[in-house]
Amino acid sequence: MIIPDSQEIIEKGYPKNKSGQTYGPDLSDYVGSVPDLILAESEDGIKGYLKKTDKDSITSSSRTLPLYLQDGQTKIAELTLKTK
């Protein structure tokens, strides 16, 4: 699993995977955009990437979403998001 350096993202922008998806921690306050794959951590402490499109589509009060490697295809864990 690759986690890009925050300072490098601020200086050069988010890296892209082979599919052209950007990935990394959400540094939108510094770079003005959210990556396609957002760094997240499961309840079990597994770090992975949450697809922005999955997160944006949440409509229920609780939803379990897959976490992926930076390739955006290899599922490694699940994350339960809760909305208010």
Predicted regions, residues:
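Extended, alpha-helix-rich binding/interface surfaces that flank or overlap catalytic cores
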Residues: M1-K84
